Amino acid sequence: MQKENLLIELGTEELPPKALKSLRDSLKSGIESGLKNAELSFDSIEAYATPRRLAVLVKQVETEQQDKEVEKRGPAINVAFDDTGKPTKAAEGWARSNGITVEQADRLKTDKGEWLLHKATVKGQALSVLVQGILEAAIKALPIPKPMRWGDSTAQFIRPVHTLTVMLGSELIDAEILETKSARFIQGHRFHSPQGFELDHVDNYLFKLREAKVIANFEERIETIQSEVSRLASELGGQVIQDDELVEEVAALVEWPVALTASFDQGFLAVPKEPLIVTMKDDQRYFPVEDGKGNLLPQFIFITNIESRDPQQIIKGNEKVVRPRLADAQFFFESDKKVTLESRVAALDSVLFQKQLGSIGDKARRISVLAGKIANQLTADVKASERAGLLCKADLVSDMVSEFPETQGVMGKHYALNDGESPVVAEAIEQHYWPRFSGDELPLTKEACAVALADKLDTLVGIFGIGQVPKGDRDPFALRRAALGLLRTLVERKLSLDLHELLAASVEGFGDKLSNNTVATDVFDFLLGRFRPWYQDQGITVDVIQSVLARSPSKPTDFDQRVKAVQSFKSMDSAASLAAANKRVGNILAKSDEEISGNVDEALLQEESETTLYRLVKQTEGAVKPLIAAGKYSDALTHLSELKEPVDAFFEHVMVNADDDKVRINRLNLLFRLRQLFLEIADISLLQ
């Protein structure tokens, strides 16, 4: 079977940078699926994307489908012929549709009857014919939320399409998509090669593009940008602030990345670095540079899409653009410093948190009280925690945060230090937002933890308290993120706090504002539910998580210890047998109508196996209860694993449902004692 390399390229106007990778990957997936569905094999498939093109290159794809032998079954013989043996209309119609006569048909005999049969060879179609449908389906499946039209065209796409190239080796394939016909013309770089070029062979595609100053490979552009930016930063004696999203976005904006260094007035460094970084990265897509101590340098690196004969002109242009933005940040900082954070708290009363829950000012006062209570439990500085809680939202009404919302918290820290607040208070103001996203840093001090926990609890309790529970993808108050941040802080900072107590304290702070009487229970259940995805991400199996959830531990640190202990227990040789035994015991007890107390009468023990089990259960109780009380669940489960053999022997030799009611109830009490031992840690009957 002949094979050749296939190229499909759409030449467009500038594609949205944040959508470029998903468009590329989706086009690749669509073409790949189309070829596989057409049963056309190939060696490999690569996708390319630049601001002005989407392309797929398929290596060594079959140029034609293989012929297929097919069998088409017709009507049953008793339907195909009448009583005289003459073909019926049904038989003749079927034969005609297959291009044969009834007499030319074969017979298919099975144990269920006999049918007319036509064996035919279906000739495979050429890829040059099939590619139109494959491409149409792939384009239709692209993730384009808002397609647009252009010129007089009725076609719709994410951006106007100007060229289409579909080639098989050196052959141009006749195809049309989005009212654009396939041609050999390929767009070059907008400035370096505006004339484009005619492609003579698929194998020359990447080479010819590079000649036209286009790096088609998205990942190669990323590597080029990272390498060049790091090199220039090193020449400045610094290092670039890592930001993979920024690199990816810039790579989606250029076809021929060229890195240049520019500078700004050193006087701007009197402004905290965070708003300067936000200005350079988010507004201008520049790469700020820090020294080895984390101090911002008065230089930045930027990527241009052109190799200029006069790069100084480009550098000066970018310096001119960034200067007023940095000046704005400087003005906001100097202006904001004239007003203390404490005096801004009153202004928070005019900023709405939620209609039924009041203002941000109300929230800050609740956070302050709750943070003090939490700090007391953590033996932290109560006054500092209360102070930080009161001031933690005050920077929201500053000019800087109004202009650069990403700097909330960190600007609060700078303003607090400027006001003479203690470093403990200032750090807590910044860190109370932590963690801000998955994998982010956690609050570092106990005081910061107290304020962070209070803030998240206030949001969770407040929103649940008015019945606005997250549903599906809707979570406008980011309650899932708040819940996970709260749990991570408690677990990873090893803060042994009880959720029931925390929730009760938070509910108290709302007075009569909450309409949901079960809010504390609802939030508790919601928090425990967030453990599941968190532990799954860590490789903990669902059955282990469920076994601990069944016990509903109210301290997240305790929950964590149990999960890790059960995960370790599950790998023991005895785990499967004991899990099955616990399940069996649970079923037996569930079916019993007797009142089971766990009190075992030794005089009623008749079989050696039940006597042995009772003795060992008592011994194990004495050994594991102190371990459980100390949170040493792994050690406790190791002791419990030694019950495997006596439990197996009990079920092998003892009839639980004895005829004698007293003996039966006594045995149920023994099983109850056994089950309770395991349930002190987790419901291991749920282990798979």
UniProtKB/Swiss-Prot annotation:
HAMAP family: Gly_tRNA_synth_beta (MF_00255). One of its GO terms (molecular function) is glycine-tRNA ligase activity. It is an enzyme of class 6 (ligase). It is found in: Cytoplasm. PROSITE patterns: AA_TRNA_LIGASE_II_GLYAB. Signal peptide: none annotated. This is Glycine--tRNA ligase beta subunit. The gene is glyS. GO terms for biological process: arginyl-tRNA aminoacylation; glycyl-tRNA aminoacylation. It catalyses: tRNA(Gly) + glycine + ATP = glycyl-tRNA(Gly) + AMP + diphosphate. Keywords: Aminoacyl-tRNA synthetase, ATP-binding, Cytoplasm, Ligase, Nucleotide-binding, Protein biosynthesis. Tetramer of two alpha and two beta subunits. Belongs to the class-II aminoacyl-tRNA synthetase family. Its main location: cytoplasm. GO terms for cellular component: cytosol. Its EC number is 6.1.1.14. It comes from the Bacteria.
